[in-house]
């Protein structure tokens, strides 16, 4: 092989190496940007959507339901006696309870449903194309599945229960913040009625404090 031809192939190889290096740098940058985007949308502990993410995604989903004139619902969940679990068994066990709850929600919810951790021991779900009876059925499946969770700590079985509040677009409109308020009032009514239960926004408050919360 002649010297000019050898030099040509050597130059071509160098050019290819440079091109591959730029491609790799570009792919790494794209991967880093994707990782940062996902991290900004994800609750670090549970892997579920964080509050900011579910607020944004739920608004989009509810707008689509409104435009198509179909019902939707929002569920607000709060783990019962979670502070007692943390105080009695430690925050590591509390973290495990939150993780197990997220896994349970992921397994129970339907394709197209959204859920995320919105703070502390609270999770929110947005259910598109869902009537009030269907929302109640989903909420009850969630409550039942979580009631079957059992974590062990030093030979002690830790049982977990959850209270769930439901708000439907048929009664509360399509604004996510308003739906969350209605679901929050229903959730506190579930707490007032003994916990480990599901209530919707039609529940009549049993105590003045809950009546005031619903009216505010």
Where are the model-predicted features located?
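Short regulatory alpha-helical coupling segments
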Residues: 38, 51-71, 102-110, 128
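Catalytic core regions of nucleotide second-messenger enzymes
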Residues: 146-162
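Short helix/loop segment flanking the catalytic signature motif in cyclic-nucleotide metabolism enzymes
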Residues: 97, 110, 124-141
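Membrane-embedded alpha-helical segments, specifically the hydrophobic cores
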Residues: 1-31
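Catalytic-core segments of nucleotide cyclases and related cyclic-nucleotide turnover enzymes
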Residues: 136, 154, 169-216
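Residue-level recognition of strand-loop junctions within catalytic nucleotide-signaling folds
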Residues: 87, 127-130, 147, 169-170
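A short pre-motif secondary-structure segment
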Residues: 114-117
């Amino acid at each position: 092989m002649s010297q000019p031809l050898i030099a040509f192939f050597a130059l071509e190889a160098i050019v290819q190496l440079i091109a591959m290096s730029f491609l790799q740098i570009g792919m790494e940058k794209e991967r880093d940007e994707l990782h940062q985007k996902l991290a900004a949308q994800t609750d670090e502990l549970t892997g579920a959507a964080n509050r900011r993410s579910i607020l944004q995604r739920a608004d989009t989903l509810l707008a689509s339901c409104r435009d198509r004139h179909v019902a939707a619902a929002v569920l607000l969940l709060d783990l019962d006696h979670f502070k007692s679990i943390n105080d009695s068994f430690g925050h590591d066990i509390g973290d495990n309870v939150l993780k197990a709850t997220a896994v349970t929600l992921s397994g129970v919810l339907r394709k197209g449903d959204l859920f995320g951790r919105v703070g502390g021991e609270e999770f929110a779900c947005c259910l598109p194309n869902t009537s009030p009876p269907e929302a109640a059925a989903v909420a009850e499946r969630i409550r039942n599945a979580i009631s079957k969770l059992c974590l062990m700590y030093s030979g002690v079985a830790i049982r977990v229960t959850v209270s769930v509040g439901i708000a439907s677009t048929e009664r509360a409109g399509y604004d996510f913040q308003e739906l969350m308020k209605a679901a929050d009032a229903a959730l506190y009514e579930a707490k007032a009625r003994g916990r480990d239960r599901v209530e919707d926004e039609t529940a009549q408050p049993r105590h003045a404090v809950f009546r005031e919360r619903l009216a505010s």
